[in-house]
Amino acid sequence: VNTDGEVNGSSDTYVAWNWLGANGTASNSNGSITATVSANTTSGCSIVKWSGSGSNATIGHGLGVAPSVVITKSIGGSSAWGVYHISLGNTKILFLNETGAVGTNVAYWNNTSPTSSVFTVGSDAAVNHSGNDMIAYCFTEITNYSKFGFYVGDALNKGGPFVYTGFRPAWIMIKRTDGADTWTMYDNKRIGYNVDNNPLFANATTTESTDDDLDILSNGFKIKRNSGRINTDGANMVYMAFAENPFVTSTDNGSIPATAR
């Protein structure tokens, strides 16, 4: 990093969350637009670059399994970060840099779910900006490493939702879908113990909050706070959760336990 205050300001404390792609890139012509792809099938993530067309198109992702989450951004444009999430389906989108509720439009994903080889984009600039290079970060579930889903908030009326992931999460992001609220992120490094897991917000530049929202457990996470952004009564909350490392292979059948805490 250089000396810029966004990444290395004097006396400031920073956090970085990193996902490993492949050691290099490869051309991928599985879709209607040829893309440049760095794919790591072990961890279930790929980075995809293509030239936006502004019209319906398919893009190869290199994972060999349909991604559960696709995050898109126009590199040269000011359009929003588009988020496809499997729990929302192929007609809806969220925007990572905004607080708004889920949006519905055929122009986002052309009402088409990702396949084992491609994801589909429509004409909206957030997903396929005409004349601009686009980037996408694709994630598929890996047993005992990553989980993408939703839960329903209870405002602590039932003690707070427990979300089973099958592993101890190292990083969690949550977004309410039916109303305006923040993208809330937690990790096991900044504080690193329950009940003091402080949130940061993907859509904001503010410092971390001191709210104690959840406990990170050996097999998932437990919501501990009556907060609109993560526990509105009756509201759907989508989440992404990752463990420290993808320890299992497809033949392990989930047999390796997470470390208890």
Regions found by a protein language model. Name each.
Residues V1-R261:
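Surface-exposed molecular-recognition determinants
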